[in-house]
Regions:
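C-terminal capping/lid segments that line or modulate ligand- or cofactor-binding pockets
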Residues: 512-514, 522, 676-696, 742-821
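Aromatic-rich carbohydrate-recognition surfaces in CAZymes
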Residues: 455-570, 798-815
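Extracellular glycan-recognition surfaces and repeat-rich motifs
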Residues: 64-98, 233-263
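Extended, low-complexity, turn-rich repeat/linker tracts enriched in Gly/Pro/Ser/Thr and Asp/Glu
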Residues: 119-120, 130-137, 190-191, 283-284, ...
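Extended ligand-binding clefts on enzyme/binding-domain cores
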Residues: 459, 492-499, 503, 552-609, ...
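Low-complexity, Ser/Thr/Pro/Gly-enriched N-terminal "stalk/linker" regions
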Residues: 30-31, 375-460
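Extracellular carbohydrate recognition and processing domains
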Residues: 144-180, 185-195, 310-345, 350-360
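Short beta-strands within extracellular/lumenal beta-sheet-rich domains
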Residues: 97-123, 136, 166-168, 262-287, ...
Length: 821
């Protein structure tokens, strides 16, 4: 039979006089003063008021948790019992009528007593049951600031009578006169992971008798922040477990588990315990790294990062990339602890699982990085508190939107709005074919968003596919967590390859077409997320690595070289490859995924400018006012200047307006050389400039441009029997010769953007009418469609335009805006 114990392995450098001051004393005899609500009666003695030294309701004789404060779900008044025996019929050794019995083993939490002053002999006594893994279940003595002064566990635990209460005495005399509280902590969900207790007596004139077991102080080793180095002692296990503390069963973490700098306890995966590092001060960039494997059961095997003194958990994670086929191999992880710079922390590796692969492999811990790791891709450690156990329900959002839907009288509008609003989440049915929702959720809190009929995630599309949900982040945590998870996935994919536009679910590249909007859209979504939620946690070191990757890529493409990126295949023979660097950012492809004719795509440059300006504002708001903010501001300003210099034309009919693409050679506003005049459906587009944030809707250059793109002078503006709108060279309806005015092929998304950028109510309503009546009887939006025959369309399953339509209808027609008040 295994017995719980506390084993300390540490170097002499940590055995300071400050720590020795908390040593436990043994021997001697005394009587206890129980206070009015404990069962024992003190002997006659001089009348001295001991009220200040006595815990209130220390024996739970009130029949509840009066004078105690519970946090979490591990402790409740329902756990207070007057039963005389345990669940298995054995004597429980309680005192008086009541005690706190076994309760909610699978829950975590804490229970804190009233304040009392340490006095008399400094000894206290108590009874403990359960709590086999003393690294996770224990009794702390804390001061008013929650700093831990002492820690005791049920070190005499016996599995055969696990619930039986065992009597302990503890010497607190080294903290004589301090006001303190008792805090029962239960961080265990299994393996006798509960605490039962009774009869807390906190004042004795002399040391209690030898009948009590002397409780051993097992708190983490810590002196002060000033005395704490920035590195962990023996982080590479070169000296066995010197500097490390272990708790739990003796064979859970042992020197025998170390080989070649790696600790792996797989050989004893049936044992449970905790491995605790020496304290370290967060320094440098605040990033730490380690290699971690196994941890197959994240609720029981994980890494916990805690504050020294208070033991507040600031981060919990596991090896989410590990698979059974990896065996004892480890994966590299980086964790961002920069918000705790200057503070002392420690690491706890928790193994509370007896199941197969319920083990931990660990190596290569590094707690000091003076520079951010530039090679970072998907090696970020995710906090388990954001782990998505189940698919989110979006209950609050659905309740609001379903109310809107039920009030729509027009059947076609009602069906179309419902289908398009929920398309990203739930999918829809078209012509007898069921299409599922496009979001996939991961345990690490990230989310992947398919584009629809293509099994890949576009950085651009995925940002727009959640547009209709964004305002609900204000009231629905599921929406908030999904968008947060989507952003984290986008950041990861950008770090993998900033030139790629689409990725497979496993992180590999689906398509590598360099498009400016692939970098601008995630920045746009980032600002939306922050403005609505106020959550700045994701703007950590890993975000800065991502932003640096984006800025470096954009800066390089202002001086484009094929050595950085080159157009390959037959696309290189399309358009004009010659260009002149002029301060604009080079782009290989448009948001349609078609190759650019001229390589400076003006709407894409506009989007980059507005996205960077927003990021500068965000960085200021979250206090990141360093070099990276200055780089973003400088790039945005210079590109804006270049757009207004090289991207404009004084049209004889429309006046000063923006070009669609330019080659950078012509700054003459009255010349058309090297300039392409058109607009296309995919976004970013010229008509979308105010929606992108580049200019106001009443900006005169935009007003002139809008008049052009919504006229027959735009070669891709189509007028048909059922509707009119902007199309795109990238269409699969009509002939292959573009443009084809004989077969008018507008896109739903361009009509939606026309409505979103309009201030004319009649125009907005007309756009919605056009879209609602041209679904070809499918009640969802498509890509291109024949304006003379809406049943002739491309792409049944394309959720991007669905999101635009739903957002337009919800905000501009029904006026639902949770962000205004």
């Amino acid at each position: 039979m295994k017995r719980s114990r506390w084993l300390l392995t540490t170097g002499l450098t940590f055995l300071t006089s400050a720590l020795l001051g908390f040593a436990v004393s043994c021997g001697g005899k005394s009587e206890k003063n129980t206070g009015s609500d404990n069962s024992s009666t003190p002997p006659e003695q001089e009348t001295v008021s001991t009220e200040a030294f006595e815990i209130k309701n220390g024996g739970f004789e009130s029949g509840d948790l009066k004078n105690w404060t519970a946090e979490g779900e591990a402790f409740s008044a329902l756990g207070v019992s007057n039963e005389a025996t345990t669940d298995d019929g054995q004597e429980n050794n309680k005192s008086g009528e009541y005690y706190f019995a076994k309760y909610a083993e699978s829950a975590e939490g804490s229970l804190t007593s009233s304040l009392f002053k340490i006095g008399g002999s400094g000894f206290i006594t108590f009874k403990l049951g359960g709590g086999m893994n003393v690294g996770l279940t224990y009794l702390s003595v804390v001061d008013e600031a929650e700093r831990e002064l002492f820690r005791f566990g049920n070190t005499a635990f016996q599995e055969l009578n696990a619930e039986a209460l065992i009597e302990y005495k503890a010497d607190l005399s080294s903290a004589m006169g301090k006001e303190v509280k008792i805090k029962i902590v239960d961080n265990s969900k299994d393996n006798f992971g509960y605490m039962s207790f009774d009869d807390f007596v906190t004042y004795y004139e002399t040391e209690p008798s030898e009948a009590f077991i002397s409780a051993e102080d097992i708190k983490p080793l810590y002196v002060s922040a000033e005395a704490t180095p920035s590195f962990i002692k023996n982080a590479d296990f070169a000296n066995g477990l010197d500097g490390w503390q272990t708790a739990g069963e003796e064979d859970c973490f042992a020197v025998e588990h170390i080989s070649g700098g790696r600790l792996s306890n797989k050989s004893d995966y049936g044992a449970v315990g905790v491995l605790r590092s020496s304290p370290f001060t967060v320094s440098g960039t605040g990033v730490i790294s380690y290699r971690l494997g196994m941890t197959a059961h994240p609720s029981k095997t994980y890494l916990s990062v805690k504050k020294c003194g208070t033991n507040e958990e600031v981060f919990r994670t596991h090896s989410d990339r590990w698979k059974i086929s990896h065996g004892e191999s480890t994966h590299l992880y980086y964790a961002d602890l920069s918000k705790y710079k200057g503070e002392a922390l420690y690491l706890e590796f928790v193994d509370n699982s007896r199941e197969q692969w319920g083990a931990i492999s660990l190596e290569a811990i590094d707690t000091v990085y003076e520079k951010l790791p530039a090679s970072l891709k998907d090696e970020t450690a995710f906090d388990i508190k954001y782990r998505l156990e189940d698919d989110p329900t979006y209950e609050t959002m659905r309740e609001t939107v379903d109310g809107v839907i039920s009030g729509i009288e027009d059947e076609t509008l009602r069906k179309t709005f419902k289908n398009t609003f929920y398309a990203t989440l739930d999918g829809f049915t078209v012509n007898g074919t069921n299409y599922s929702g496009v979001l996939r959720y991961y345990e690490n809190g990230t989310a992947f968003c398919y584009t629809g009929d293509i099994p890949a995630m576009w950085l651009r599309d995925s940002s727009a596919q959640v547009l209709q949900y964004l305002q609900f982040m204000k009231v629905d945590k599921d929406v908030r967590n999904t968008v947060r998870g989507l952003l984290l996935k986008q950041f990861e994919l950008i770090r993998r390859d900033p030139y790629a536009n689409a990725f497979n679910e496993n992180g590999s590249v689906w398509e590598r077409k360099f498009e400016l909007d692939s970098l601008a859209y995630p920045l746009w979504l980032t600002k939306q997320y922050y403005d609505i939620t106020g959550d700045g946690e994701i703007f950590n070191a890993f975000f800065l690595v991502t932003l640096d990757k984006i800025l470096t890529t954009l800066e390089n493409e202002r001086e484009h070289k094929d050595s950085n990126y080159s157009i390959i295949s037959e696309d290189r023979d399309k358009g004009v490859n010659e260009f002149k660097n002029c301060g604009l950012i080079w782009s290989g492809y448009r948001p349609s995924d078609d190759v650019c004719h001229y390589k400076f795509f003006i709407p894409g440059n506009m989007f980059v400018v507005s996205a960077l300006e927003d990021i500068v504002s965000l960085l200021e708001s979250v206090g990141l006012n360093g070099e990276i903010k200055d780089r973003a501001a400088s790039l945005a300003a210079s590109v804006r200047t270049a757009i207004e210099t090289y991207g404009v034309y004084n049209h004889p009919k429309f006046g000063k307006m923006y070009a669609f693409e330019v080659d950078g050679s012509n700054a003459d506003i009255n010349s058309t050389d090297g300039k392409l005049f058109m607009d296309a459906a995919n976004i970013p587009s010229l008509i979308a400039a105010p929606w992108l944030g580049y200019c106001d809707v009443d900006d005169q250059t935009y007003v002139n441009t809008r008049a052009f793109v919504l006229s027959d002078d735009n070669p891709y503006y189509y007028v048909g029997e059922y509707t009119s709108g902007i199309g795109d060279p990238h269409d699969m309806v009509g002939s292959t010769d573009n443009p084809h005015k004989d077969v008018p092929v507008p896109w739903h998304m361009s009509i939606a953007m026309q409505g979103l950028t309009s201030t004319d109510k009649a125009e907005i309503e007309r756009c919605v009418k056009y879209m609602t009546e041209t679904t070809g009887g499918t009640f969802v939006m498509h890509e291109a469609f024949n304006a003379n025959d809406p049943t002739d369309y491309s792409r049944d399953y394309f959720t991007w335009p669905c999101s635009l339509y739903a957002h337009l209808v919800l905000t501009k027609i029904f006026g639902v805006n949770l962000l205004n008040g």
